[in-house]
């Protein structure tokens, strides 16, 4: 892999952005740029790349950062042009252009959030590796999670309630990525959307809810214990009780005893 000089990199990225009116040409030139600085000596196992199973160019980190910083500005300033570029990048097989597409998608303005959700849903259903879903949702919902978290949570709730098992898997990883990224102050919003699903949980949704509950415990055990006690006080659903009992080993000893004591009062 040839070394890349920062002034050349900056100039090259600016030249690429001048092709924004010709998305196909831009992506063609960008692909050649990726290929020119690919690490052909990379061997799996020498160092870790959180990339699922997608083939990767293994370009210099500086190059990927510079491209992402520049291209997300196009998303903010010229969103319609950015969408065309995003769709072409997402059609590539390699990791780097797909991650760039997700980063651009995640910085489209609020009026484009419906298009953001539509693309993420389509892309996610075609992904096999959980690791790829994690970075896809983290990058692709960056602005939506900041400006309209409820809109994103409503979509995840719809997927979780769907009759399509593929949507359940997508919803779990979407919600997991949001929980992992959430501040403690935003957890109540997540609990709000989970509440009806937990109260009406069934054998169909039980595995997905177990995974989500595990992530919530890791994020904030105390908040999650309080949330579960509220649920148990509002529902006689035996599946919910089973879910809580099966999840007890995930809690600390003190939290387990607190929940067992609460269960005995029901």
Residue spans of the language-model regions?
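N-terminal alpha-helical scaffold/docking segments in eukaryotic complex subunits
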Residues: 1-88, 217, 232-266
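Structural detector for internal amphipathic alpha-helices that build alpha-solenoid repeat scaffolds
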Residues: 36, 51-77, 99-110, 132-147, ...
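Amphipathic alpha-helical scaffolding segments comprising HEAT/armadillo-like alpha-solenoid repeats
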Residues: 43, 77-87, 110-122, 146-158, ...
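Short coil/turn helix-boundary motifs
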Residues: 74, 78, 92-93, 108, ...
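Hydrophobic alpha-helical segments and helix pairs
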Residues: 88-132
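Alpha-helix N-cap/helix-start positions at coil->helix boundaries
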Residues: 95-96, 126-134, 165-166, 199-207, ...
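Short amphipathic alpha-helical segments
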Residues: 189, 193, 204-212, 223, ...
